[in-house]
Amino acid sequence: MNLIYNFSAGPAMIPKDVLYQAKKELQNWNQIGCSIMEISHRSKEFIQVALEAEQDLRDLLNISNSYEILFCQGGARGQFAAVPMNLLGNFKETDYINSGYWSNCALIEAKKYCIPKNISVRQKKNGKSFLLKPSQWNISDNSAYIHYCPNETIDGMSIYEEPNFKNKIIVGDFSSFILSRRINIENYGLIYAGAQKNIGPSGITIILIRKDLIGYASKISPSIFNYYIISKYNSMFNTPPTFSWYLSGLVFKWLKKQGGIKKIEQLNQKKSNLLYQIIDNSNFYINDIDKRNRSQMNVVFHLYNSKLDNLFLKEAKNAGLNALKGHNVIGGMRASIYNAMPLEGVQSLAKFMLYFEKKYG
């Protein structure tokens, strides 16, 4: 079988070593005679898996004991509702940094529970789109929290400077950003992330929340979205997606073996630079995003002639390069190169892009 590289935006590629281990253990995990999918989430065996996953994540991101780690369900969209239901307190107003598709989705959902201020930070200059720095955000004085999304997977744009507004609670949708680079957790009140991009398979959502922010859920909050209840029951108030939890734990161990987040960050920079260098040296491929806001995780580009799009995708697939079609919202191409994508995969795509341009440019 020829080698296939999967550039899907999510569910996304999982490290091959992790898949091999899961395959090896699938029918007889830890020599107990059955799959980990078949054992109770309250068994001592699975509780050990959960504890190790939490500790490995703490080690990777340097998360102090002043933060709770919750393993939940419902994805990022579930958190679009859960965040205001848990963090509003006596406030009615919130600040939502609108940088693209997903941050706008969070804003729309929040309108059901609070009065979100739409703070648009996307601008254009000399034909290039860019995002305002946190110091330029028009933050309210009386908002319960500030919500933002540091990486917009559809738009291919990122905010790399971490916000720091002293006593303001910062909430981050890190679904496509978590574990890709070093961050200062202490800057945030809450971080949430769907697993299916940089963590593991879909089905589990990870929340990092400052402990002093737990316990203020509104009365309308469903129990499974109430952070206090989730915390009280150690993320097992209802039956969790045990296989997703287990596989996420394997990914955490894999990341540690790679040298941790510092090494991963360096590799991610190298991978994205390969593709952006080809785009910048070409009139065939187009990316209209300012260099300071280009996503390292999701490299978006258009062909100079959109009539070549289907041919590009067809020939790319024949070359073992899958899932490069851009989101329907903006079209074009998108190469999602999360942590699991090896450098060799990006090099193969770069080589193909040069070939395709030479043939059809």
Curated annotation (Swiss-Prot):
NCBIfam families: PRK05355.1, serC_1
Cellular localisation: Cytoplasm
Pathway(s) of this molecule: Amino-acid biosynthesis; L-serine biosynthesis; L-serine from 3-phospho-D-glycerate: step 2/3; Cofactor biosynthesis; pyridoxine 5'-phosphate biosynthesis; pyridoxine 5'-phosphate from D-erythrose 4-phosphate: step 3/5
Necessary cofactors: pyridoxal 5'-phosphate
Enzyme Commission number(s) from the entry: 2.6.1.52
Official protein name in the record: Phosphoserine aminotransferase
Described purpose of this protein according to its UniProt entry: Catalyzes the reversible conversion of 3-phosphohydroxypyruvate to phosphoserine and of 3-hydroxy-2-oxo-4-phosphonooxybutanoate to phosphohydroxythreonine.
UniProtKB keywords: Amino-acid biosynthesis, Aminotransferase, Cytoplasm, Pyridoxal phosphate, Pyridoxine biosynthesis, Serine biosynthesis, Transferase
UniProt keyword Transferase, yes or no: yes
Subunit structure: Homodimer.
Catalytic activity: O-phospho-L-serine + 2-oxoglutarate = 3-phosphooxypyruvate + L-glutamate; 4-(phosphooxy)-L-threonine + 2-oxoglutarate = (R)-3-hydroxy-2-oxo-4-phosphooxybutanoate + L-glutamate
Binding-site positions, L-glutamate: 42
Protein family: Belongs to the class-V pyridoxal-phosphate-dependent aminotransferase family. SerC subfamily.
Lineage top rank: taxon: Bacteria
GO molecular function, one term: O-phospho-L-serine:2-oxoglutarate aminotransferase activity
Encoding gene (name): serC
Gene Ontology annotations of biological process type: L-serine biosynthetic process; pyridoxine biosynthetic process
Listed GO CC annotations: cytoplasm
